[in-house]
């Protein structure tokens, strides 16, 4: 999407492009990969990189695969031990930065001895020498990394977990009664800092009774029953944002581009969604749309704004508009793909 150009994964003449499967674990097509979507193949510095485990030899190990830009000459360059599920990956300043989560514990013979040991953390791989760095882990029920951000040899990441006194049974019972209220009352949201050079993990803050913590440009944005707030990771101070949400519900996630914070609110007694951008504590209304035509911002990458919306045929779709169109209040998305009902 950055260049607007297609790239070749496989340039083999007459290749059938067979995929990876349990019966075909070594496909001849160099474009075949296997793993979670959050850790897909990335073209970076004229090489293809992929984080995953294509051999399934050990469910607690993942690898960094490096190959030519067309997928040929694939090799394992780094090993991530005690990493079960890679959930997100960034490539910055010749580093591979990723988040992972674990659930099970194995003994030395590879047998499961505990199927409920949730933990999560981040890893960093130096592409100059393939050295692996690992942060401290967070633990307790539903421990997970929700966002990662890199700047100047430091990784910031947001976490979510239940308090240490919350058991799996309590979560099941709470979810059956009122899952949203139970999560609001018992979930802990944290922001951590990992210094690569010092190999040091620091918890900057951990907050309870909030909604949807987002790590935007390294700072933590969130809402609660008291309003909207931002936690500055440099000063470690929290301040309230001048967003009037009385009688309104947030529609979609908060997003940032440059100095602007983008947000949308739907009024409880209206079928409209209003879109805003905030800068220097001043909000500007961008557009109003009916709830049937409304969209959520999935991400903002440069001048491209990726959105999810329902098309005229009632299908949930991923599309793109320009940042200039968003700022002018124009919503005429280019449809990229539509999702099936089971997706």
Where are these regions (language model features)?
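Short, conserved, GDST-rich strand-edge loop motifs in beta-rich repeat architectures
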Residues: 53-58, 101-117, 160-186
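A short beta-strand motif characteristic of beta-propeller blades
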Residues: 7-9, 15-32, 73-79, 131-138, ...
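A short loop-to-beta-strand structural motif that recurs across blades of beta-propeller domains
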Residues: 63-65, 121-123, 190-192, 227-229, ...
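Post-signal peptide N-terminal segment of secreted/secretory-pathway proteins
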Residues: 1-74
């Amino acid at each position: 999407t950055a260049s607007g150009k297609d790239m070749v994964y496989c340039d083999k003449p007459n290749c059938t492009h067979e995929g990876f499967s349990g019966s075909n674990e070594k496909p001849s097509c160099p474009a075949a990969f296997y793993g979670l979507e959050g850790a897909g193949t990335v073209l970076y510095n004229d090489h293809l990189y992929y984080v995953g485990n294509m051999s399934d030899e050990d469910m607690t190990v993942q690898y960094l695969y490096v190959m030519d830009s067309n997928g040929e000459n694939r090799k394992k360059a780094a090993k991530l031990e005690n990493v079960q599920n890679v959930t997100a990956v960034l490539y910055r300043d010749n580093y591979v930065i990723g988040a992972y989560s674990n659930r099970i514990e194995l003994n030395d013979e590879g047998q499961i001895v505990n199927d409920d040991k949730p933990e999560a953390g981040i890893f960093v791989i130096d592409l100059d020498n393939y050295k692996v760095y690992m942060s401290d882990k967070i633990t307790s029920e539903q421990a997970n990394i929700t966002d990662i951000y890199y700047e100047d040899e430091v990784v910031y990441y947001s976490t979510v977990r239940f308090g240490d006194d919350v058991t799996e049974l309590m979560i099941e019972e709470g979810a059956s009664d009122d899952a949203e209220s139970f999560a609001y009352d018992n979930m802990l949201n944290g922001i951590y800092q990992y210094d690569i050079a010092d190999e040091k993990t620091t918890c900057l803050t951990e907050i309870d009774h909030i909604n949807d913590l987002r790590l935007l440009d390294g700072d933590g944005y969130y809402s609660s029953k008291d309003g909207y707030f931002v936690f500055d990771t440099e000063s470690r101070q929290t301040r309230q944002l001048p967003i009037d949400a009385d009688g309104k519900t947030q529609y979609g996630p908060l997003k940032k581009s440059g100095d602007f914070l983008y947000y949308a609110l739907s009024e409880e007694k209206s079928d409209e969604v209003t879109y805003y951008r905030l800068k220097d504590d001043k909000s500007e209304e961008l557009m109003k749309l009916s709830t049937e035509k409304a969209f959520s911002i999935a991400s903002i990458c440069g001048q491209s704004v990726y959105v999810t919306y329902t098309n005229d045929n009632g299908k949930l779709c991923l599309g793109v508009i320009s940042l200039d169109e968003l700022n002018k209040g124009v919503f005429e998305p280019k449809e990229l793909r539509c999702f099936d009902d089971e997706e």
